[in-house]
Amino acid sequence: MSATIASLRESLCSETTPLPIRFRALFSLKHLAVQNKGTADSLSAIDAIAAAFASPSALLKHELAYCLGQTGSDAAIPHLTQVLEDLQEDPMCRHEAAEALGALGKAESLGVLQKYLHREGEDVSVKETCEIAIDRIEWENSEERKQEKLRQSDFASVDPAPPMPEDDEKQTVETLEKKLLDTSLPLFKRYRAMFALRDLASPPDLPTAVPAILALAKGLKDESALFRHEIAFVFGQLSHPASIPALTEALSNLDEVSMVRHEAAEALGSLGDEEGVEETLLKFLHDKEKVVRESVIVALDMAEFEQSGQAEYALIPEVASKAS
């Protein structure tokens, strides 16, 4: 293991390291795992990320699972499967592990995802995530996928669902909003509409950007907490000021589930240089929900980073310079 990876692993796994530093270490390790795919360094980085699943922080663990899903590496599958199978684990982490297995797109994960989709008494967000992940893996390995024409996205993330294909009639914000909010459609199809709307909102000066943001914001009223949290996540990716009112409302609603509120806090962190955002986040620094408190700490660190003009939210200079 390289000295860099060993040092990042130590920062990530230490409970005495401040949470924002642990997050930066995590993003640095994810970057190294992706850049060096297939090498011993990549495997060491993946093992380093997985080692932090011993942490008591649900926020950190759910982010570990997300990052493992973004590595594109089969070496992450056993770690993620173990988290999904651990019924003592926080449902937020288990859901993220299921989503990450979907992102990796390997048919070998279908069995375990089917198991928890149909498990009696399973948490709804875990069930729904398994349903979407199964659909994503089946799509990933289908003939249909090869025929589809997908718009080039501005985002490098591997998403829970691809955007709607471009050849699916003429895509307008209105037609996509209709699909987004149609609860009779499978979640996978609605997610496809969500990511197509995201892509119509970037770059932020597109004429479709603000209408797409306002359409997405309506999804924050959906009955599915999983769906609402994904809308907040997309807003974090877009960092568009038009989403601030909807995100502030979601974070401020104490009756909203913590899975959604924490995602809204992190999304606001990506908008940290906008007026009033830091003040909003500071109000929730002592929230009753630990995951919200921790998200606010990370969001405030991200806000500081946004204001500083640094190139990349990572820990080590060489990762920052490579990633920028």
From Swiss-Prot:
GO molecular function: deoxyhypusine monooxygenase activity; metal ion binding
Family matches, as InterPro entries: ARM-like (IPR011989), ARM-type_fold (IPR016024), Deoxyhypusine_hydroxylase (IPR027517), PBS_lyase_HEAT (IPR004155)
Cofactor dependence: Fe(2+)
Keyword Iron: yes
Pfam families: HEAT_2 (PF13646)
Annotated Fe cation 1 binding sites: H62, E63, H95, E96
Basic and acidic residues bias (residue ranges): 143-152
Pathways per UniProt: Protein modification; eIF5A hypusination
Record-listed Fe cation 2 binding positions: H229, E230, H262, E263
GO cellular component, one term: nucleus
Top-level enzyme category: oxidoreductase
EC number: 1.14.99.29
UniProt keyword Coiled coil, yes or no: no
Region (Disordered), start-end ranges: 143-171
Catalytic activity line of the entry: [eIF5A protein]-deoxyhypusine + AH2 + O2 = [eIF5A protein]-hypusine + A + H2O
Cofactor binding note from Swiss-Prot or TrEMBL: Binds 2 Fe(2+) ions per subunit.
HEAT-like PBS-type repeats: 60-86, 94-119, 189-219, 227-253, 260-287
Localization per Swiss-Prot or TrEMBL: Cytoplasm; Nucleus
Keyword annotations: Cytoplasm, Hypusine biosynthesis, Iron, Metal-binding, Monooxygenase, Nucleus, Oxidoreductase, Repeat
Family indicated by similarity: Belongs to the deoxyhypusine hydroxylase family.
Protein purpose: Catalyzes the hydroxylation of the N(6)-(4-aminobutyl)-L-lysine intermediate to form hypusine, an essential post-translational modification only found in mature eIF-5A factor.
Name of this protein: Deoxyhypusine hydroxylase
Organism: Neurospora crassa (strain ATCC 24698 / 74-OR23-1A / CBS 708.71 / DSM 1257 / FGSC 987)
Gene: lia1
